[in-house]
Each structure stands twice: as structure tokens, then as C-alpha cells.
Amino acid sequence: MKAEDIRTKTQDQLTDDLASLKKEQFNLRFQKATGQLEKTARVRQVRKDIARIKTIAAEKSAAKKA
């Protein structure tokens, strides 16, 4: 997910995306623990997407307050 795509979304959409990514991250952790994880790079990708969404959400909320 690119930052440009994330910036075009509303706060509600960002919250929904964040929730779905956290669920995916949870499932990936379980797959890793049980040895069923095939796409190991996806763990890192999901973690970075979560960080991007949190960063942009914080920027948007700071812009609203200013």
C-alpha cells in the first residue's frame, strides 16, 4: 500500500484498514509459530503498512486541530 493511496482515504477508511491489517498480522504470527507461513515477507509488509496508516492518521488529526 502506497502512502499516496492512504492519504486519499478518510479517517473511517483508515480505521477499517488498520483493523484488517492488525487481524492479518495476528494470523501471520500464528502461522509463523506453527510453521505454516509461506510468504515470510508479508509479515514485514503488513507491519510497515500499519505504520504508514498510523502516521498518516496522526498527520490528519494534527491538521484538523491546527
Swiss-Prot record:
The keyword Coiled coil does not apply. GO terms for cellular component: cytosolic large ribosomal subunit. Signal peptide: none annotated. It holds the Pfam family Ribosomal_L29. SUPFAM superfamilies: Ribosomal protein L29 (L29p). HAMAP family: Ribosomal_uL29. This is Large ribosomal subunit protein uL29. It comes from Mesorhizobium japonicum (strain LMG 29417 / CECT 9101 / MAFF 303099). The lineage of its organism: Bacteria, Pseudomonadati, Pseudomonadota, Alphaproteobacteria, Hyphomicrobiales.
